[in-house]
Amino acid sequence: MAAARAPWLWWWVVVVVGVAVAEAASGGGGGGDGEGKALMGVKAGFGNAANALVDWDGGADHCAWRGVTCDNASFAVLALNLSNLNLGGEISPAIGELKNLQFVDLKGNKLTGQIPDEIGDCISLKYLDLSGNLLYGDIPFSISKLKQLEELILKNNQLTGPIPSTLSQIPNLKTLDLAQNQLTGDIPRLIYWNEVLQYLGLRGNSLTGTLSPDMCQLTGLWYFDVRGNNLTGTIPESIGNCTSFEILDISYNQISGEIPYNIGFLQVATLSLQGNRLTGKIPDVIGLMQALAVLDLSENELVGPIPSILGNLSYTGKLYLHGNKLTGVIPPELGNMSKLSYLQLNDNELVGTIPAELGKLEELFELNLANNNLQGPIPANISSCTALNKFNVYGNKLNGSIPAGFQKLESLTYLNLSSNNFKGNIPSELGHIINLDTLDLSYNEFSGPVPATIGDLEHLLELNLSKNHLDGPVPAEFGNLRSVQVIDMSNNNLSGSLPEELGQLQNLDSLILNNNNLVGEIPAQLANCFSLNNLNLSYNNLSGHVPMAKNFSKFPMESFLGNPLLHVYCQDSSCGHSHGQRVNISKTAIACIILGFIILLCVLLLAIYKTNQPQPLVKGSDKPVQGPPKLVVLQMDMAIHTYEDIMRLTENLSEKYIIGYGASSTVYKCELKSGKAIAVKRLYSQYNHSLREFETELETIGSIRHRNLVSLHGFSLSPHGNLLFYDYMENGSLWDLLHGPSKKVKLNWDTRLRIAVGAAQGLAYLHHDCNPRIIHRDVKSSNILLDENFEAHLSDFGIAKCVPSAKSHASTYVLGTIGYIDPEYARTSRLNEKSDVYSFGIVLLELLTGKKAVDNESNLHQLILSKADDNTVMEAVDSEVSVTCTDMGLVRKAFQLALLCTKRHPSDRPTMHEVARVLLSLLPASAMTTPKTVDYSRLLASTTTAADMRGHDVTDIGDNSSSDEQWFVRFGEVISKHTM
């Protein structure tokens, strides 16, 4: 009987196994064609996936598709990483068919539409990041079905509606980041009963209601950020029970009342309460919060004195108390805060003197005491704060003189002593603070002459000495202020004539000299200040005629009022005669002008004739008595040309051949006899050292050849002017294309990356392969020229000193451009190869953002650092990059590289060889020797939870090559302000 049943049992087993195999093959159990079809459904929702997901072609092996990670046994899709691919369209409901999905990262795209309800069908999901898109609508309640979910990141979208209270039903949720959306309503109280929640980010929404006492129920919550909402009420008295908090930010809401005393029981590293309506005094107990690194109570309505016990906060680096109604004196005990780098007490009602104890703060970077009622002198030992970068005491009642020791503050870039009662002479030592970009001494009682040494501040952007009692002339040395944009010395007693050297200020926007005693004529050279938009010379004793240059016609009559001997030419009816200026010229005067012009023309023609006559050499000298300059030829394409040929081909350097201006030169285009075009650079100033030494340097530079360097073809040095002959670049400079007024050519991502690679390779050659090695010293976007194929060529390295083959490669020759200069230069006054690396990092930021290095008061590097601190760097990407880049992960890596290049300490920066190699690794696979691959299984395995990410930004570097990966590991993650 048993033997008879055996065949039937065998057939039953075969049928069961067959059905199971069939189900597995159809996708019912995990992988297979079912999930492949689901992925194709997901792709169909994306509007522009053709390029980014080119391998998503419906083929059999969906596990090999870009961004897809599968289980090795069942082939079920476990992870989907399509971040930073510039994807548009919507998230398809088909994603809900991927039942085994554990990891979804779609951040940094341009996805629109609503989050599909079907996302709740991905029941195995542990990590969901949809941040940095354009998603709108409500947060779907179906997300609460994801019982395995640990991290939910939806920040930086356009989501609306309330926060679903059902999110509290996700038992394993550790990270909830909904920042920078448009969410409304109260914060659900049930959220605070999730026992495992560690990170709650709700900043930048429109949430209302109050702070719930239940917020302290979360024993594991370390990050609580509700900054920038519409919360009201008071800070809960139970706030002291939030003992797990490390970051507490409730700033920029409408919180009122007093700061609870038991807030001192917190052990937070950051306590940020600014921008609310808090009243009362600062609790003394805050001075016991030893873990504080940042204390921000600014922009409230706090009263009373600053507690002296705050001096016990020995680990606090930032103390912001500005914008309150604080009274009393500045506690001397603040000098004990040895780690303090930012101290802002401005806009209060403080009295007394500036305590000398502040001079002990060796790490102090910014000191702002403006708009108080402080009296007395500036303590001399403030000059001991050698790291000080900004010092502002505007709007007090300080007196005395400027301490001579200020010259020790080599890092100082901003000095504002305006609207006080300072007296005496302006010390000439201020000219030694070589990194100053703003000097404001206005509205004081300074007297005596203006120090000529101020002309040494070559990085100065704004100079304001108005409303004092200064006398003497305007120093001719001001012509050296090549970066200056504003000069205001109005309402003084200045005398003498205007120096013609002011005409060298190519960046000057405003020149304000009204209400002085200036005499003489307005120098015609001022017409060379092509950036000048605001000119006021009224109420002086100027004479002669206003220059008739085109750019002077834009200035109104009011610019020249109160100069009885000054003739102003009216060019339209708008100037009128109502102001009493002389506008009529007699016939006799006209005849004299014409006669004088004829005589001048004759003298000029005679001088030209004599100049062109050959002159004998002076015995024993290599210089002719007079005659045309010699042309030194360094490349064969100029071998048949003479100096006279160049002058003839450019019509004596006629304006119509000008193709650009610089701070120290004008550039002309010249077409040689062969038809080849070259660029002729005419230097404004003569070489100050041995002419033969300069020739030797130029001959050395002319011998350097590299595909990414602009070649020097020849030069001509003489009292007539120094001319340098370079390659002509059809597409001008990178600065012109990024920031110029026309911007005719849009630079896509691939072009920008190739430009960065080319410039890096050129600079790497100068640093490492050139003999002698050369430090450029002025790397900037205007010194990166582009040929007809947009290949980058580094120019102006000829002005650098050659580095000898010794162990030290530093030099003391001062060069650089504001915005690009290494901060370390402020401390040491020395530049080296790593200074060039810093400048290149700024150029790379320009390429990525399309923004200028310095624009008015905005500093690109500081902007990116602040965004790095908020983990919003990708918001700064230029729109043309976003549109044309198919893998935004490459852009993030480029940002990382730029921030590595601009680290504060030179030893932490890479070399240019390393920079060039990493940039090469970012080029498209077709340009690489080996194709790039991305190991997403490694990413999935190493996904870091929020609890492990404190203070760090998790970014997948990819697996470009082992050496590149080691390089990134060597220098570490950089999207953290503490590592800059």
From Swiss-Prot:
LRR repeats: 75-98, 99-122, 124-146, 147-170, 171-194, 196-218, 219-242, 243-265, 266-289, 290-312, 314-337, 338-361, 362-385, 387-408, 409-433, 435-457, 458-480, 481-505, 507-529, 531-554
GO molecular function: ATP binding; protein serine kinase activity; receptor serine/threonine kinase binding; transmembrane receptor protein serine/threonine kinase activity
Stretches of the chain found on the membrane's Cytoplasmic side: 610-980
Extracellular side: 25-588
Induction, as annotated: Induced by salt and drought stresses, and hydrogen peroxide.
Signal peptide as annotated in the record: 1-24
Protein topology in the membrane: Single-pass type I membrane protein
Residues carrying sugar: 72, 81, 230, 241, 312, 336, 381, 399, 416, 464, 493, 536, 541, 551, 584
GO biological process: embryo sac development; plant ovule development; positive regulation of response to salt stress; positive regulation of response to water deprivation; regulation of stomatal complex development; stomatal complex morphogenesis
PTM statement from Swiss-Prot or TrEMBL: Autophosphorylated.
Compartments, as annotated in UniProt: Cell membrane
Catalytic activity from the UniProt record: L-seryl-[protein] + ATP = O-phospho-L-seryl-[protein] + ADP + H(+); L-threonyl-[protein] + ATP = O-phospho-L-threonyl-[protein] + ADP + H(+)
Major localization class: membrane
UniProt keyword annotations, A-Z: ATP-binding, Cell membrane, Glycoprotein, Kinase, Leucine-rich repeat, Membrane, Nucleotide-binding, Receptor, Repeat, Serine/threonine-protein kinase, Signal, Stress response, Transferase, Transmembrane, Transmembrane helix
Catalytic machinery residues: D778
Binding-site positions, ATP: I659, G660, Y661, G662, A663, S664, S665, T666, V667, K681
Domain of life, source organism: Eukaryota
GO cellular component: membrane; plasma membrane
Name of the molecule in the record: LRR receptor-like serine/threonine-protein kinase SIK1
